[in-house]
Amino acid sequence: MSANHTRMIDLSKFAEAKNAALLTFCSVWMGAIITLLRSPDELPLGFDYAFKASLTVLFIAAIISLKSLMPKFLNQVHKREDEYKNLLYFGDIDQIGTGAYPGMAADLYTPTEGASATPTYLHDLAVQTAIHAKIAHRKFRLFNWAGSLVLFAFGIMMVPPILFCIRWAVNRLHC
């Protein structure tokens, strides 16, 4: 169970790294597009319209990527029916405080002789594993949305050269 918990944390970290990279990618492209749009020279082939539309789509993708990096707290992903404190969750540890935490952890998590773990520890670990799985799933889902928007933005930027090629080919056929 501990290995599975570690795996869920690793998946969350991986998804977060992907979203951070996508946010950086969007930021660089938005900066480049803004630089091109601010140029005093007119952009060829209608790129100004494509860049303006792409800029909007990239901005939305960047917002989604940024949203995925925002932390989720236990009460946002797991509804409790009592005042139980999960001593594996940083928010509960913070509420308990430094003075009380070591004693509570020892009372709840020290196994009896012959046992490798307490039922309370296994329960808390299972809850944390499930929560990290939800968080990782959310981060990957948001990455897919943002990544799809980035691909859509690139599709928009491809419209002017594709139209140019089509016009060029049609003009060659009429010769």
Curated annotation (Swiss-Prot):
InterPro entries the UniProt entry points to: PycTM (IPR043760)
Keywords: Antiviral defense, Cell inner membrane, Cell membrane, Membrane, Nucleotide-binding, Transmembrane, Transmembrane helix
Transmembrane regions listed in the UniProt entry: 17-37, 44-64, 146-166
Topological relation to the membrane, as annotated: Multi-pass membrane protein
Recorded GO MF terms: nucleotide binding
GO biological process, one term: defense response to virus
Principal place of residence: membrane
A Pfam family reported for this protein in Swiss-Prot or TrEMBL: PycTM
Localization annotation: Cell inner membrane
Key word Nucleus present: no
Cellular compartments per GO CC: plasma membrane
Keyword Transferase: no
Summary of the function given for this chain in its UniProt record: Pycsar (pyrimidine cyclase system for antiphage resistance) provides immunity against bacteriophage. The pyrimidine cyclase (PycC) synthesizes cyclic nucleotides in response to infection; these serve as specific second messenger signals. The signals activate the nearby effector, leading to bacterial cell death and abortive phage infection. A clade A Pycsar system.
Protein name per UniProt: Pycsar effector protein RsPycTM
Organism: Rhizobium sp. (strain PP-F2F-G36)
